[in-house]
Regions:
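Alpha-helical segment of the N-proximal tetratricopeptide repeat
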Residues: 9-45, 345-379, 383
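"A position-specific structural signal for the A-helix of alpha-solenoid helical repeats
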Residues: 14-17, 21, 51, 55-59, ...
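Hydrophobic/aromatic side-chain positions at a characteristic register within alpha-helices
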Residues: 15, 24-31, 60-64, 68, ...
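Alpha-helical repeat scaffolds
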Residues: 38-40, 68-76, 108, 375-386, ...
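Boundary/linker segments of alpha-helical solenoid repeat arrays
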Residues: 47-53, 78-92, 222-223, 389-398, ...
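Alpha-helical linker/edge segments of TPR/alpha-solenoid repeat scaffolds
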Residues: 61-72, 83, 94-115, 405-418, ...
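Short Lys/Arg-enriched alpha/beta "domain-start" segment
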Residues: 90-175
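Short acidic, low-complexity intrinsically disordered linear motifs used
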Residues: 279, 504-529
Length: 529
């Protein structure tokens, strides 16, 4: 998915070129450590070749040596005079640096013996700051899961139904995690409790609260190191983490609004003022005034973009680069001979999408579906959908589904619904028409439920009751579960299922343009009516 081609190295003597070609051949057959050593040997005499250091870095990375890969790529970034190549090398180096640092926050676990699991769970369930959640069922071949799990919050959960006072500063935050296990008779282990969280004030406060709540029911183990370090997270990543505990019945639109507010705070306050090792300890705001940090700052913004993508958030990259006075990487020049499959992800994102030929665009769309950078995928699909010749060679249903997900995830519900309608008009030959329409009606239902007052929700639910329910009666429970999540009453409670006399109305396969079946005198009640 992230192809990286070794750069062309055209400098050096005839003997040096022979060694460089040998290194390239080793790299081509997967002998990356040997190739890296050969490339590195040449840097002792050709000290100022960005391409050589770039090659060393890629081979070290392919061989799994991220520390030396980062060192070589940092060096290549310093030597390149080509700004895009420099930024790409520096971006890779910073990505490798993230988890190869001593500046870490330990994830710690305390272990305690439990006198009575039943009594303990009763005590914990009574605590307003202890939020119990479901644990996965045991699967064959895996260790038994905990009998119960809790989050310890910094304040009691808000259960609504009025969430008007919920804000970024009032949302309950996660302090620690509790797992409770039954005794293991075969191993001779007693019932146990594990308390896990980031080392610091929050974890110790959670531990004190647990000791108070479960007094006489647990005892910390003295035969083991307490706490045990079970993991770590980079300290620089801490400002980008947030540990919310949102109410289960919080409307999805409100959840999305709060997430967008949090991202806005990160982009405008948190990240611009955070000290970054890649910037010599300076913050992005400070580094923006120092031309020596131009490449490193641009790379740091691309690393931030990668983090946003992991969290399903789309950063307006061009605007954010401009905010710090950094120029966007220029579009690539392409022609019919350009080997698009050899481009790195960052290079692919620089393609002039509108200028690509139809076959090139199809190739880019297929790859973008794998790499799943939301901003780039949306742009590529948007153009592809305007070209009928492209649609013939794309996995159209997958592309339409992806477009709906992109729009919905970004809060563009109306646009997502438009693509649902487009999809209905482009039936698949791989499934029956009934199944095809059912799938897209379910997609529409999920979107409509984001706003229970949507007037189009009633006729859609009527369709499920009168058309789908007689044919697939087992789907009722699933639909009702969806509705209950959004506080919408079951339509089966207020709309009569069609009788045999009206069965002819629904005997034909439903189509989007067909009139809805006649409903009984009773109607669906929705909040606000």
């Amino acid at each position: 998915r992230g192809s990286h081609a070794l750069p062309v190295i055209s400098i050096g003597t005839e003997e040096q070129q022979k060694e460089i070609k040998k290194a390239q051949k080793y790299a081509a057959v997967g002998c990356w450590n040997t190739a890296a050593d050969l490339f590195h040997t040449q840097t002792r005499t050709i000290t100022d070749s960005a391409e050589l250091w770039h090659s060393v870095g890629l081979c070290r990375a392919w061989d799994g040596d991220e520390v030396q890969a980062a060192e070589a790529l940092h060096r290549a970034a310093q030597l390149y005079t080509d700004f895009p190549a420099s930024v790409e090398c520096e971006t890779l180096a910073q990505l490798f640096d993230r988890f190869n640092t001593t500046d870490l926050i330990d994830i710690c676990t305390y272990e305690a013996k439990v006198e009575s699991v039943g009594r303990l769970l009763t005590l914990l369930d009574e605590q307003p700051r202890f939020l119990r959640f479901d644990v996965p069922k045991q699967t064959e071949g895996e260790a038994p899961p905990p009998v119960a799990a809790f989050q310890i919050l910094d304040r009691p959960q808000i259960n609504g139904p009025d969430f008007s006072q919920l804000s970024l500063d009032s949302i309950p935050k996660f302090q620690a995690h509790i797992s409770v296990y039954d005794a293991d008779q075969e191993a001779g282990e007693p019932a146990s409790l594990y308390l896990t969280g980031d080392r610091g004030v929050d974890l110790e406060e959670a531990r004190s609260l647990l000791e108070s709540a479960a007094a006489g029911c647990i005892s910390w183990r003295t035969d083991k190191t307490q706490p045990e370090v079970t993991g770590a997270v980079p300290a620089e990543a801490q400002p980008l983490r947030w540990t919310w505990s949102l109410p289960k019945n919080l409307p999805i639109t409100r959840t999305r609004d709060l997430r967008n507010q949090q991202w806005k705070r990160i982009f405008s306050e948190t990240w611009p003022n955070a000290s970054l090792k890649a910037l010599g300890g300076k913050s992005p705001t400070e580094a923006a005034n120092d031309p020596r940090h131009k490449v490193a700052l641009a790379a740091a913004i691309y690393v931030l973009d990668g983090h946003c993508q992991q969290q399903n958030h789309n950063l307006d990259l061009a605007a954010y680069l401009a905010k710090f006075g950094v120029e966007s990487l220029p579009p690539l020049e392409v022609d019919e001979s350009t080997q698009l499959n050899q481009l790195s992800v960052m290079q692919m994102h620089r393609l002039p999408i509108e200028k690509l030929s139809d076959p090139q665009l199809v190739s880019v769309v297929n790859r973008a579906l794998l790499t799943r950078h939301e901003g780039f995928l949306y742009k590529a699909l948007k153009v592809a959908f305007t070209r009928p010749a492209c649609e013939e060679h794309m996995d159209l249903q997958r592309c339409l589904r992806a477009m709906v997900e992109l729009c919905a995830g970004d809060g563009r519900r109306d646009e997502a619904l438009q693509y649902v309608e487009i999809a209905r008009g482009k039936p698949s030959q791989d499934v029956s028409q009934f199944e095809y329409q059912w799938n897209w009606d379910m997609t529409e239902l999920a979107l409509r439920l984001e706003d229970p007052s949507d007037p189009a929700l009633k006729p859609l639910l009527d369709r499920f009751v009168h058309y789908y329910s007689p044919k697939v009666p087992q789907m009722r429970g699933y639909i009702e579960q969806m509705l209950s999540t959004y506080g919408v009453p079951s339509p089966w409670e207020s709309i009569s299922i069609v009788t045999s006399a009206s069965a002819s109305v629904t005997s034909a396969v439903w189509s989007p343009n067909a009139p809805a079946p006649a409903a009984s005198p009773s109607k669906l009640w929705l909040p606000g009516e």
